[in-house]
Structures are given as structure tokens and as C-alpha cells.
């Protein structure tokens, strides 16, 4: 059985024709845009798309990550989400060092937060802990 199916079974998620998984995706600007458009055309009742992780859809190359490149990635996903009135949730990692503001722990530049409508940061006190807290911030 696939890893996705095993996880569904482990968490007690019933199989449904309204839940779809894709285990491969193009890069933003290089296939992903078309994949997303095709998906919502085939599934017009889509309300949520989760991308896990954002790093997998970034262009790989010599360009260093900058505020502009981070802002562009989120901006393109936001434009797609707004066009289709859906939520696109991207999973991204945090830095391991502590920060005064928990959102400063997000890996990358502030461009990731600057363009998104909102951000959620889930943290555990210990990696093996069963409980976590979620901090939420909105652009407005």
C-alpha cells in the first residue's frame, strides 16, 4: 500500500471521492501552474489545496532566495487562490534557533509573510511531544 494510504488508515481517515492526493508536482513557473489549473477544472468543487512542502515547488538553481523571490512564489499561489476562491495552504519549515517573535523562526525572508493573507505557525516544546500550539497572524 502507498504511504498516503497507510497514513489515512493510521489516522482513521475514511476513503472518499472528495479527497485527492498528488505525490508529484512541477515547479512554480514550470508545470505547477498548469497542474493546479487542470486540477480545479477537473474538480470544480475544490476548496483547499495543500502544498507540502513549499521547497518542493521552488525553482532549483543559482538564484539565492530573496525577499523578491519569496514574495513572487507566494504571490503566484495567492493569485491562483483568489482567482478560484479557494485556500492554498503551503507547508514550510522553521529555523531551529529561537526568536523573539515566533514568526521570525520561519525559514526564508519576510516576503513569505508579506504576501500571504495569513500565516499559521505550529510549534512543539519538544519534537516528540504530542501537543503543539498554533500561532496565527493575518495581513489585515
Language-model segments: which ranges?
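Phosphate-binding/switch region of NTP-binding enzymes
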Residues: 48, 67-140
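Conserved inter-motif catalytic segment of the P-loop NTP-binding fold
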Residues: 2-68, 72, 79, 139
